[in-house]
Amino acid sequence: MSAVLTSIEKTAVQLDEFRKTRLKDRPVDFDAYMAAREQDVALVKPAEDFHDALIEEFHGEEKARGLYLPWRKLDNLFRIRRGELTDWAGFNGHMKSTVVGYVLLELMRQGEKGCVISLEMKPRKTLRKMATQAVGTPQPSKDYIGRFLDSVAGKLYLYDQQGDVEPERVYAVITYCAEELGITQFVIDSLMKVVRDEDDYNGQKRFVGKLHSLARDLNVHIHLVTHSRKRENEEKRPGKQDNKGSGSIVDQVDNYAVVFKIPKKDDDPGPTHCIYLDKQRHGEWEGHIALWLHPSLQFHQDGLLRGECYV
C-alpha cells in the first residue's frame, strides 16, 4: 500500500510541476478575462431595448437632438450634442478661441454649464472677451460687467493654469467638473499645450481618443481648439488635411470645424469670417456659414451693425 501511495504521490508531483510550467509559459489572468467577458456580454443588447431612445431620436424634445449655435441658419443643419467631441481648427490669428467663446455663451443661455481650460490665456482675458460678447460693446460699464458675471454665476468655470499641462491632468479636471459640478460643455485651448511636440503622433492620438471616450462616458461635449499648418499664402482656407499633427485627430473627432478669416479690404462690406463644417459624424450636412465680426467680438450671420446685449 505504501509503495502504491508513493507512486501516486510522485505522479501528482510531476503533474503539478508540468502544470506550473505551462502556466508560467502562458500566463492567463482569469479574473480579468471573466470581468471583460461579462462586460462585453452586458453591452450586447437586442435592438428592441432601444425603443424609447429611437422614438426620442425622431420625435423627442428639441434639446434631445442637440443645442443651438448662435446662428439660426444652422438650427436644422448642425447642433452641439452631448457625448461628442468637436475640433475647432484654423490658422493662427483667425479667432478660433473667440468663436468658441461666443458659442459657449449661447450654450449657457440654453441651460448648459461650461468650463474653459485655456492654457494660452489668463482667466481675466478670457472673461474680458466673453463679457464684451455678452454685453454687445467693446467697453462695458462696471454695471454691465456685474450683470454679465451674474448671468454666468454657477454656469461658467475657468481652469486657472497656463502653459504646458499633462494629459492626465486634463482628464482629471474634466472628470471632476462633470461629476462634481455638473458641467456639460468643456473648451480645451489648445491641443499643443497638452501634447507639446507637433510630431508626437501617438501622443496626439491617445489624447484625442481619451477625450472622445470622456465625452461619451460622461455625456458632455468637448470643444478642442487645434491649429492648422502655416502656409506662405493663407488666402485659401485650410481643410482637414491641413490640421497640424496626426491625421488621426480628424479621424477620431465627431465634428471638424474650420474658422477662417476672409482676406479682404477694410472697406469691403462683405463677411469677415467663415466657419466650414468639414465633418459631422452624426449629421448629414457639411458646408459653411458666412459671418460678420462686430467690434464687441460677436459674430453675426446677417451683417448686423449693432451689438446685441444678452444680459
Question: What are the residue ranges of the model-derived segments?
Answer:
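Helical hairpin unit composed of two closely spaced alpha helices linked by a short loop
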Residues: 183-224
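C-terminal regions of RecA-like/P-loop NTPase motor modules
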Residues: 3-16, 27-33, 45-46, 171, ...
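The Walker A/P-loop phosphate-binding site
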Residues: 35-137
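Conserved H-loop
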Residues: 119-121, 220, 224-227
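Hydrophobic/aromatic beta-strand patches that form the interior of the parallel beta-sheet core
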Residues: 86-88, 115-117, 157-159, 223, ...
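Core recognition of P-loop NTPase motor domains used across DNA-transaction enzymes
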Residues: 1-82, 150-153, 214, 288, ...
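Alpha-helical scaffold elements adjacent to nucleotide-binding pockets in ATP/GTP-utilizing enzyme cores
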Residues: 103, 125-130, 173, 210, ...
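Conserved inter-motif catalytic segment of the P-loop NTP-binding fold
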Residues: 2-21, 28-31, 52, 65, ...
